[in-house]
Each structure stands twice: as structure tokens, then as C-alpha cells.
């Protein structure tokens, strides 16, 4: 299984390898050889990582709340990209904990509102001031918060569900997942342009039957054969719009899955409507700081 970069044993995270390795070895090889190498990501606790499978390219300006996490360096943005994220407030980007576990703020940067990674004219590039990982992260509670060095204005952040409600994750309802992750289950292919795919929400019962470590209190499943997130999409948002309401509601953070877009193996997301996710965060010293940044 893979993390859409990689947590819990037996599954895979959906990010693109280790920041430490990429910052040193990968970017060094690119500089010396003139070749290309896709960035790696941090430790994933044994689970698999994610990319968009079965999706379509999005036009410039689509989903401006999307964030791309990049390893700092001289390489091309596509080669330095390792995870996704979403703008939660002008000062905070939310991503997966496994993307930034054991990573120092000075090692990475993020760009918000960019559709094409190579287009430096698009979006807002920001350094990272602090990284806060959920205090209960151990594969579950796979969420982290990046405090930006400067606010991002002019882009509407995503909305979050009311904690404790399951109204937005009814089985069969449709949501969208977006990212710059792998697009081919056989040959790793990482796109320069943002891609997205619509996926159905899968019941807790079905997900538990597939993943023994699935925790319905903090997880939600989505995807169908041929349509899924994949490696490189980790940390990105699973979201939907609501009739009669403005903006986008993020219901999940890309976490892990068994392969990508495989039959009977939907992607697993950290559920952002989980009361337990937020209650346990707010009670921690780190969480109190995030709460202040989000004005909650």
C-alpha cells in the first residue's frame, strides 16, 4: 500500500519521498547531471503515497486555494514538488502530517494559487515559519499546519465542515480531489499542470473491510477503480461545493491507499469534519497556537 506519501504499516502514503534526501541527493544529482529527478518525501510510517488517476487538466485559475509544497533549492518546481496542501487562512496551509514529519521549516516552501508548477508568474510563494503536526499523529490524525512567513491575500481559503457532522460524507456522494501527483499506475508520470478528478465517497464499512487500521472517527474513504489520488497528491484536499452556499468545503486531506485507483481499494483521507480530530488538537499546546492563527 502507498502513501499518497506513506503512514501505517501495510499501506502507502501519497507523497513523493524524503525532503532530506531530496534536498541533498536528488537536487544535487539534477544540478550535476542536468537530468530530472522527482522530489522525494519524509518518513511515512509504512503506508503508501498518492497522485491523481483518471482526472483531467484544469485551466489557469482553477482551485486557487490549492498549495504545492516544494523542497527549497535551484531545481525546477516540478522536480522539487513533493506534496499538496490547501489554504486554510491567509497565514496557514493545511497538509498531511506524513508530508512534513521530521522536516524543518527552512527546508521547504509553498506556493498557493498556482495552476502550472513551472509558471513562476502564477500564485504566491511563501516561506514556512513553523510546522505544527497533530499531537496524536501516528499514521492516524494525519494532518499538519504550516504557518506562512507572510499572509496570502486575494485568495479565498477553503471552508471546513462543522465538527461532528457526517452530512458531507454520505456514501455515494461526489467529491473532488486535486493535485500534481502521479497520473499513471504503471509508469510514474508527474504533471506540471494541476489535475482533478471526481470520486464517490465510500462507506466506513467498506473501507474497514479493506484497511484494518481504518479509523472511522478520523478517516473518510473515496475513490473507485480508475479514479483516485496517488503518489505526490498527499496533503492535498478532498473537497466539494454545496448548493446554496458559497465557497468550497474541504472534507478530507489525502493520506494513503493500497496502490492507486485499484479495484476495491479506495483512497483514505483524514476527515476534516471529525470532532475528535479538532478537539484533540485544540487541547495541545501546539494546537492552541494553530487555533489562534485560524481565529477559532
Regions found by a protein language model. Give the residues of each.
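C-terminal region of N-terminal signal peptides and the immediate post-cleavage residues
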Residues: 30-51, 292-296
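A conserved glycine-rich beta-strand in the N-terminal activation segment of trypsin-fold
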Residues: 64-66, 72-90, 139
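Secretory targeting and sorting signals
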Residues: 1-40
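C-terminal subregion of chymotrypsin/trypsin-like serine protease catalytic domains
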Residues: 40-42, 87-93, 97, 108-109, ...
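N-terminal activation segment of mature serine protease catalytic domains
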Residues: 45-74
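Chymotrypsin/trypsin-fold serine protease catalytic domain
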Residues: 125-127, 140-225, 274-280
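Conserved H-D interstitial segment of serine endopeptidase catalytic domains
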Residues: 69-72, 93-96, 101-136, 206
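Acidic glycine-/aspartate-rich tracts in secreted/extracellular proteins
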Residues: 72-74, 98-102, 113-118, 149-154, ...
Amino acid at each position: 500500500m502507498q502513501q499518497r506519501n506513506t503512514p501505517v504499516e501495510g499501506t502507502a502514503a501519497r507523497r513523493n519521498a524524503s525532503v532530506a534526501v531530496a534536498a541533498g541527493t536528488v537536487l544535487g544529482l539534477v544540478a550535476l547531471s542536468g537530468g530530472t529527478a522527482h522530489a522525494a518525501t519524509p518518513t511515512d510510517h509504512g503506508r503508501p503515497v498518492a497522485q491523481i488517476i483518471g482526472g483531467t487538466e484544469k485551466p489557469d485559475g482553477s482551485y486557487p486555494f490549492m498549495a504545492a509544497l516544494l523542497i527549497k533549492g535551484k531545481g525546477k518546481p516540478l522536480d522539487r514538488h513533493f506534496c499538496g496542501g490547501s489554504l486554510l487562512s491567509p497565514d496557514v496551509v493545511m497538509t498531511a502530517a506524513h508530508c512534513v514529519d521530521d522536516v524543518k521549516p527552512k527546508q521547504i516552501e509553498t506556493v498557493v494559487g498556482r495552476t502550472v508548477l513551472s509558471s513562476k508568474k502564477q500564485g504566491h510563494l511563501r516561506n514556512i515559519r513553523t510546522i505544527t503536526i497533530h499531537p496524536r499523529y501516528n499514521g492516524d490524525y494525519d494532518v499538519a499546519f504550516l504557518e506562512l512567513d507572510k499572509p496570502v491575500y486575494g485568495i479565498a481559503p477553503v471552508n471546513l465542515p462543522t465538527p461532528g457532522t457526517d452530512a458531507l460524507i454520505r456514501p455515494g456522494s461526489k467529491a473532488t480531489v486535486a493535485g500534481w501527483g502521479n497520473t499513471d499506475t504503471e509508469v510514474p508520470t508527474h504533471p506540471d499542470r494541476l489535475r482533478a478528478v471526481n470520486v464517490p465517497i465510500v462507506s466506513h464499512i467498506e473501507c474497514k473491510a479493506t484497511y484494518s487500521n481504518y479509523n472511522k472517527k478520523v478517516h473518510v474513504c473515496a475513490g473507485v477503480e480508475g479514479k483516485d489520488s496517488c503518489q505526490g497528491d498527499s496533503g492535498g484536499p478532498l473537497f466539494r461545493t454545496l448548493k446554496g452556499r458559497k465557497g468550497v468545503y474541504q472534507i478530507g486531506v489525502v493520506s494513503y491507499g493500497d496502490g492507486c485507483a485499484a479495484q476495491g481499494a479506495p483512497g483514505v483521507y483524514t476527515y476534516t469534519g471529525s470532532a475528535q480530530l479538532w478537539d484533540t488538537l485544540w487541547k495541545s499546546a501546539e494546537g492552541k497556537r494553530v487555533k489562534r492563527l485560524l481565529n477559532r
